[in-house]
């Protein structure tokens, strides 16, 4: 989804200010890729909203992909404890000022499980995801667990994540190609991560020079 040039400058300004102040968690930016602080002194309400949204997230700049990846620290905690999870993240391109919303789904199990499909359920709705043929998993000796990852572009289905964030309970059922299944109820931290990412996503898309 396209961002205005103003929104792009605003994001860069927020990241630069956080870098100088040491305020954003897990912040790793390339200063050379960002404008000088004097050039991005935007101090309106949208600036404050974006600063607040990003302060809860990890913002990492990649010189390889020429952009920023925005993710939740809750995801790192989940992965390090071998917990299943449904965690969205954002990618903000430096080259064409676009923001992309992606959902990463991770499944950990005691036996190898190559995912075929994932069903997500709330009290009122069911959402079905079909996995690709590529196996992105393996065995983690440190965690003593098998895992598989699936990634889905969500720009056209952002409302799914908004609905999950508002639900009292969300359950994901992972189904393997061998017919095995594993159920996972999203934790409080997982739901909060979705809320935090969606708040940043909405703020970025709603930002304008007015």
Predicted regions, residues:
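A generic "folded-domain core" signal
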Residues: 13, 25-210
């Amino acid at each position: 989804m396209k961002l205005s040039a103003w929104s792009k400058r605003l994001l860069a300004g927020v990241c630069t200010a956080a870098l100088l102040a040491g305020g954003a968690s897990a912040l790793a930016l390339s200063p050379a890729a960002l404008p000088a602080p004097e050039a991005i002194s935007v101090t309106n309400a949208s600036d404050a909203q974006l600063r607040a949204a990003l302060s809860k997230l990890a913002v990492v700049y990649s010189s390889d992909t020429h952009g920023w990846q925005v993710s939740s620290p809750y995801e790192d905690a989940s992965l390090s404890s071998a917990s299943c999870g449904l965690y969205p993240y954002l990618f903000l391109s430096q080259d064409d000022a676009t923001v992309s919303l992606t959902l990463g789904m991770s499944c950990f199990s005691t036996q190898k499980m190559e995912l075929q499909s994932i069903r997500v359920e709330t009290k009122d709705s069911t959402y079905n995801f079909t996995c690709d043929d590529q196996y992105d998993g393996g065995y983690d000796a440190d965690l003593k667990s098998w895992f598989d990852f699936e990634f889905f572009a969500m720009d056209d289905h952002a409302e799914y994540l908004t609905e999950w964030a508002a639900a009292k309970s969300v359950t994901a059922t992972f189904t393997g190609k061998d017919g095995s299944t594993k159920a996972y109820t999203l934790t409080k931290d997982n739901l909060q991560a979705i809320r935090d990412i969606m708040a940043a996503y909405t703020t970025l898309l709603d930002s304008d020079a007015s």
